[in-house]
């Protein structure tokens, strides 16, 4: 039996986490030749490789190394570098998830008439200033099959004119992800490692460009962290994206001792 040749594209750590069990199932299938591609749009060891290691996911088959100096340059590099790979591999199907720049790989796939499957389709925030809103709309409308997490997402796509036979509600793969890794989560010693008491700490993740690169928003974020620390006197663990760390270092930010900036 001829195997279906499927390319899956990832580029960010949330995609890697959410697709971890899907990719494992695709790898295990006797009916599928699964090819995993990493765009390399922010290929930093702490942000990506550690997730492949910790989640037990194999190394990608191909890296696009598409990182650019700007978001626009990165998108351009992704489109330019995926196309010759598609020409070489000649896949039967193409899978992307979500709304980051990596999902725009679907554009060259569409031009080559490769069937596109889009997971996490139909999500909308209705804020055109958000770059991901543009990405998700583009990919939703060029995909052959949109896999939604909810009835609401499905309804959004129907209202935008997509035919019902191109939309399948699957639910979120995070259910399988959490169930699979639950023993590891329960066995984790992270609380003792960080000297934290259960239920008496805060976890913060804030790395979006509009929050970090905007001086007023960034200063407001730091002020909020200090106020929360002062009010509750609990440790605040901040998962610190490189963009956030660069801003902290460049501004020589001062925070209360309860605030800890840790690697993601």
What residue ranges belong to the model's regions?
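Structural beta-sheet core signal
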Residues: 8, 36-38, 96, 118, ...
């Amino acid at each position: 039996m001829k195997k279906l040749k499927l390319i899956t594209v990832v580029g960010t750590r949330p995609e890697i986490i959410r697709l971890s069990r899907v990719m494992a199932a695709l790898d295990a299938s006797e009916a599928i030749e699964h090819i995993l591609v990493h765009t390399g749009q922010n290929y930093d060891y702490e942000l990506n490789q550690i997730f492949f290691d910790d989640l037990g996911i194999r190394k990608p088959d191909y890296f696009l190394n598409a990182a650019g100096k700007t978001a626009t340059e990165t998108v351009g590099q992704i489109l330019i570098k995926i196309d010759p790979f598609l020409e070489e591999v000649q896949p039967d199907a193409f899978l992307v998830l979500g709304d980051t720049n990596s999902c725009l790989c679907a554009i060259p796939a569409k031009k080559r008439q490769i069937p596109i499957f889009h997971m996490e389709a139909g999500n909308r925030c209705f804020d055109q200033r958000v770059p991901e809103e543009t990405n998700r709309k583009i990919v939703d409308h060029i995909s052959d099959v949109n896999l939604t997490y909810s009835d609401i997402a499905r309804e959004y796509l129907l209202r935008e004119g997509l035919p019902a036979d191109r939309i399948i509600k699957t639910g979120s793969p995070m259910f399988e992800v959490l169930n699979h890794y639950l023993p590891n989560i329960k066995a984790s010693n992270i609380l003792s490692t960080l000297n934290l008491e259960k239920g008496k700490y805060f976890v913060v993740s804030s790395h979006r460009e509009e929050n970090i690169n905007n001086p007023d928003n960034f200063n407001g974020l730091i002020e909020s962290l200090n106020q929360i620390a002062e009010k509750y006197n609990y440790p605040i663990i901040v998962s610190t994206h490189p963009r956030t760390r660069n801003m902290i270092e460049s501004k020589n930010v001062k925070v209360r001792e309860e605030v800890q900036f840790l690697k993601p």
